[in-house]
């Protein structure tokens, strides 16, 4: 799993590539805090671009939940976007699509967080 970053408007986009499983989850968790710091400092929401994530295991799902929990300690917001069909199916079966904000495209996610990066109602 590798991580590619960019900024678009009020969104820090983190693109995950490859697989998020037991072997890569620790690296993802270790890589996340500096991005959470930057997002909090710059008042950005984090959009996880999953368009190039091929697979997510139960350990990877746990990683997503921990990321959301960490973001809340920063008063931040994490949303996911552009899920591949297999990853989308895993999200649906595990009901993660009910727990996390899921967008069909990165552009839609960026538009959704544009007015409220931390998720508060305006």
Please place each PLM-identified region on the residue numbering.
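Short leucine-rich amphipathic alpha-helices used at interfaces
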Residues: 2-3, 45, 86, 114
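Short beta-strand/loop segment at the start of cytosolic alpha/beta domains
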Residues: 1-15
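General small-molecule cofactor/ligand-binding pocket signal
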Residues: 6, 81, 103
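Intrinsic disorder/low-complexity segments
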Residues: 12, 40-41, 72, 110, ...
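Residues that form or immediately flank small-molecule/cofactor binding pockets and catalytic motifs
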Residues: 10, 85, 107
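A charged, well-structured terminal subsegment
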Residues: 101-122
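Amphipathic alpha-helical interaction surfaces in cytosolic regulatory modules
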Residues: 22-100
């Amino acid at each position: 799993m590798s991580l590619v970053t960019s900024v678009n408007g009020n969104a820090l986009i983190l693109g995950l590539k490859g697989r998020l499983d037991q072997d890569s989850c620790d690296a993802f968790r270790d890589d996340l805090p500096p991005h959470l710091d930057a997002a909090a400092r710059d008042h950005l929401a984090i959009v996880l671009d999953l368009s190039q994530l091929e697979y997510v295991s139960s350990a990877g799902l746990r990683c997503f939940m921990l990321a959301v929990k960490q973001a809340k300690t920063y008063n931040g917001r994490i949303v996911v976007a552009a899920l591949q069909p297999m990853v989308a199916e895993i999200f649906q079966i595990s009901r993660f699509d009910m727990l996390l904000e899921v967008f069909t495209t990165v552009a839609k996610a960026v538009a959704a967080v544009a007015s409220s990066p931390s998720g508060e109602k305006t």
